[in-house]
Structure formats: C-alpha cells, structure tokens
Amino acid sequence: MKKKALLPLLLGVMVFLAGCDYSKSSNRDGFFYNTFVEPMSKVLHWLGHSVFNDDYGIAIIVLVLVIRIILLPFMLSNYKNSHLMREKMKVAKPEVDGVQEKVKRARTQEEKMAANQEMMEVYKKYDINPMKSALGCLPVLIQMPVVMGLYFVLRYRIGGGIAEHPHFLWFNLIHPDIWITIIAGVLYFIQAWVSSKQMPQEQRQMTYMMMIVSPIMIIWISLSSASALGLYWSVSAAFLVVQTYFANMYYEKVAQREVAPMIEKFKENNSNSNKKGKNTQVVSKNNKKKK
C-alpha cells in the first residue's frame, strides 16, 4: 500500500516542480516560499558560509545527515512494525486465507460485510493493525517539502553564496553533472533492492516497479537540476541503504522473538484441542461397546 501511494505522490511533485517559478524576485512570496524555500536558503547558506567556510558540498551532506537523524525514530518504528506484522501474518495466514475465500465467494453486501467483520476479528486476535503500515509514508511526507525547498534554492540560486563557491569534489554544485546523477540513480536502485529482500514474494512486484521508477525519476530531475540536488539524493540514498540493511537484520530477530510466545500459545491450544477431540472419540467408542 505504501509503495502504491508513492507513485502518484512522485508524479504530483513533478507537476508541482514544473509549475513554480522563483526566478523573479517578485514571485518569491506565498506560503510555500515563506515556509520552506526561504528557511532552507537561510539554513543552507548559514552552514555553507559561516560553519564550513564556504564549502557548500559539506553543508549539503550535513543537512542530509541532520534530516535523516530527525527521521530516524519514525523509520525505526516503521521497520519494527513491518517486521512484526510480517511475522504475525505468517501465524495468521491460514485463517486470513480462509476469510479471504469467503470475501471472494460473497455475493451480497451482507455477506461481504460479515466476511470483512470476520477478517477484523482475525486481525484483532493476532494483534495485527493494518493502519500502522500507513505510517510508513510519514518520513517521505516530512522530507518532501524539505527536498522541494532545497530544489528551488538550488535551481534559482536564492540567497547567493553557493553561486560564488560552487565547486565540490569534481563537479560544480549549481550545474547538472552526469556522474553524480548516475550515482544517485544507482544508489536509489540499491536502496529499493535492499528493502525488497525482506518482503514476502507476493508483495515484491510493486517494489520491483519502484526499483525502476524511482531511479528514473531521480535521474530525470537531476539531469535538469543543479548537481547539489544529486548530491543530496546520493547521500540520502547511501544513508538509507546502510540504515535499511542493519535495521532489517535487527528487527527481523526482534519480531521473531516477540511473536514466538504467540506461536507457542497457538500450538499449545491446537494440541489441547486435538487431545480433547481424541478423548471425546475414545469415550464415544467405549459407550458404544457398553451398549
């Protein structure tokens, strides 16, 4: 669900970016400019000029790291919830599949409502909350205005500073650079691939689509934008690759450990149910023999 929601979101961002023009000073006003673009300009130029002695490349890298650290609690919570839901769904799958069959066979609205209600009861039984997965979009939504603010600061060189000291490593921060663009695209592909490794097979199709769509959109925007934006995306993607790899490795074990008592409980209940069934059969046979 989360990945499906990102596609129209990214397309909407493209339309938004194409429609805004801050090249003229008279256009530099309004809610979005005053809330995101102007503050981003001040932060970037304060870091670049005052803190890092006119090294705007380092300023952008530090800005990425600060944003990623702010988002880290949301991301870690999302990783944990995803792994917990995945492990719980493994336990609940037989019952979920049975209810889904009822939903498919339902012919009337009443039957569909009854089946959906039964599904909610199964989710409640296994402590599964599908709404938690929707929170996975929160870091993206938080970061989006920041990225768009940075985009306009770099595209229209709002605030000067970076235009006077544009050089970082091998490229010019205010002009497009093919190599940093390729690096950004490749890193976003790797990030999507690392994320997909922990997903069930049936959920990977949308992730595979994102592995193609995201890098293409990143490359497309970067080719017509200041390479500073490509630098931002490259550092952000590299951080995400490392974060995703270690978070998945850790929270997979945490989820398995937390769900283990639930699995044991249901195994014990099933075992007791089977014993009761066998005892009932034995009593029934003995009664028949007495007769």
From Swiss-Prot:
Secretion signal span: 1-19
Region (Disordered): 266-291
Keyword Transmembrane helix carried by entry: yes
GO MF term set: membrane insertase activity
Database matches in CDD domains: 5TM_YidC_Alb3
Entry's Gene Ontology BP terms: protein insertion into membrane; protein transport
Gene Ontology CC annotations of this record: plasma membrane
Superkingdom per UniProt: Bacteria
Keyword Transferase appears in the UniProt entry: no
Lipidated residues (N-palmitoyl cysteine): 20
PROSITE patterns in alphabetical order: PROKAR_LIPOPROTEIN (PS51257)
Annotated TM spans: 56-76, 134-154, 170-190, 211-231
Principal location class: membrane
Keywords, sorted A to Z: Cell membrane, Chaperone, Lipoprotein, Membrane, Palmitate, Protein transport, Signal, Transmembrane, Transmembrane helix, Transport
Membrane topology recorded in Swiss-Prot or TrEMBL: Multi-pass membrane protein
Membership in a protein family: Belongs to the OXA1/ALB3/YidC family. Type 2 subfamily.
NCBIfam families in alphabetical order: yidC_oxa1_cterm (TIGR03592)
Free-text function comment from the UniProt entry: Required for the insertion and/or proper folding and/or complex formation of integral membrane proteins into the membrane. Involved in integration of membrane proteins that insert both dependently and independently of the Sec translocase complex, as well as at least some lipoproteins.
Protein name: Membrane protein insertase YidC
Origin organism lineage: Bacteria, Bacillati, Bacillota, Bacilli, Bacillales
Record gene name: yidC
